[in-house]
Amino acid sequence: MSINEVRYLTECGSTNAYVKEHFEEFGPVGAVYTTNQTAGRGRLGRTWVNAEGRALYYTVAIREPLAQPATLPLLASLAVRDQLKLRYGVDCQIKWPNDLLLNGKKIVGILCESVSYGYEQQGRGILCGIGINLAQPESYFDAADLPHGTSLELQGAKVDLSTDPEWLAEGLTDFGFDRPMYVFARDGFAPFRDEYRAACINIGRRVTFDLPGGGQGAGEAIDVDADGRLVVRTDSGEEHVFTGEVSVHGIYGAV
């Protein structure tokens, strides 16, 4: 599979919105990135706060049919984790399904969306947006009301804002998505499961999760199955969780 393009934008409202608008211009795997995103989505309805020049905002477009498209966020979390370890030597943990934590604080957020394109919107693709906190100061997270967020620089990494965004964008596109995509497109999440489980901070901890019919369940997270679902042992048996909010005891202030 060849990479069509990694496109840099000096400024962008939202890299996800840009890729949706230009989806047909990309090959099987292509990407866009910026360090100045002015109209992103704040978590849980919060107002978006831009960190101009101090964070990487990246979206990859995938036109390849996928065996398990719903598990792309899990693959994406591994892709980012690997690139951050290569660049900075940090060992991030994954909060299921796709938040990356460093020293217990969130350093990466991921949002995947389906896309329709082409004649009468009959084409189907998927995009994956990734935000990496590179060098925001503590005051940024205070202003954005993100008490559980942090940046690589705040955690002691040596960040070079003149070169790192391009290095990470190229590395994510080539090594994070393009190279494993043949296996992932054919076989889904299963070949990546062991690596994911080893990095998943949920496993062995008490979690609270949303139930499909409403309400919440609680128990100990014991595994991530081959379909990417979080396996939770509850008082009434095992639950396989795939959607909804999951809180982890001791993470983000959850008790």
Protein language model features and the residues they cover:
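N-terminal lobe of the biotin/lipoate ligase/transferase fold
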Residues: 1-90, 106-108, 115-116, 254-255
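Long, positively charged amphipathic alpha-helical accessory segments at protein N-termini or as interdomain linkers
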Residues: 65-67, 74-92, 102-255
